[in-house]
Amino acid sequence: QQNARLKAQDVGVQTALEDSRQMLRDMEADGLLAKGTADTKPEQLGSFEGLAAEVKKTVLGQDAFVDSVVRAMRRPFVLGTEGAAARNVILLWGAPGTGRHFALAETARIMAARGLLQSDRMAVIDLALYPDPGTEKLFLQDLYAALHAPGEIVVFEHYESCHPGFLRILSDLAVKGSAPLSSRYLVNKEGILVEAGTALAPGAVSRIDPCGKYLIFFSRKGREALADKFGASFVAAVGDVCQTAPFTPEALAALAAQQLNALAQRVHSRLGLTLTAGAEVRDYVAAQCSKEKGAEGLADCCERIFRALSEYCLQTDAKLSGTVALTAAPEGLQFALNGAAPADLFSLLPAAYTGA
């Protein structure tokens, strides 16, 4: 009888745990929690142990970069931070399409799932939008909003195109821990920074603080270019410089396989077809990596494949089923549905507009 009671108790505990996990999954689906929170093991909560290895499951071919990004995010947990100072100032640089943004997003997602961040949300500021002194008010409003937005990461893009005066403000945030404002500002009911004019007003804002956020700069250039724009004191305040590497052929093959697997799932869920592709198709997709686009060329190729197959499905009102096989020929990719004769895949796509 006691055994039966204990068994029922155990079943009750398991049911409660599963209900709790399901609630977490629902919150993930609604965007209230980072993906992966429900499946995080208890021993991983609050820990960086094995975090880089987990990121490398989805971020392929950039192992050293992932290690350096995780190290950069961990640094303030080891060194500690003071007050509203920046948690860490980080430069992520490398060629386009080498996974800089994806690696940061995955690191933040897993950190949030482990309770190391409150959320994986990031505020992004495109500094190219502030090229001259006339954009000062807009810059200060956007900077203040980003630093007070939900999440603990503020990302800065295209610092190379920003007005030097605004870069000095960012430098002050990193070096001095706050930046003084030349005019008196107030925060209105909507949380927007507005000029207070000449009148003395309660609650005036005279400086901007980093609010304990990670300040992360993206660039295609390294430390020297950063010093040219911001100065040596700013570069000295940068805690970590993380650089991506060119993809090896093996890494590109793995990335292509990952993209094709995702494509197969999409084709199955959207078009109701089973997609098959051999090593030659994987190599064809891998070869779409270019100096200009990097690995984005692989994603673009898979998007074209999906659009071409969608066009094929749209040519008939009957619901198609079965297997569509992709093959690579010297002239390009070919497809065959249920063993039919292979046909050119990309000829299904509408002709590009040329303006003629």
Regions found by a protein language model. Name each.
Residues 34-44, 58-59, 113-119, 148, ...:
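Conserved C-terminal "switch" segment of AAA+ ATPases
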Residues 104, 136, 148-192, 226-237, ...:
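Conserved AAA+/SF3 P-loop NTPase catalytic/coupling segment centered on the Walker-B
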Residues 45-88, 307-314:
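Pre-Walker A (pre-P-loop) alpha-helix and adjacent loop at the N terminus of AAA/AAA+ ATPase modules
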Residues 82-120:
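Walker A/P-loop
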Residues 86-88, 148, 182-220:
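AAA+/SF3 P-loop NTPase mechanochemical coupling elements
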Residues 119-150:
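Short glycine-rich substrate-engagement loop in P-loop NTPases that contacts/grips substrate
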Residues 26, 30, 79-82, 96-105, ...:
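C-terminal engagement/docking regions of AAA+ P-loop ATPases
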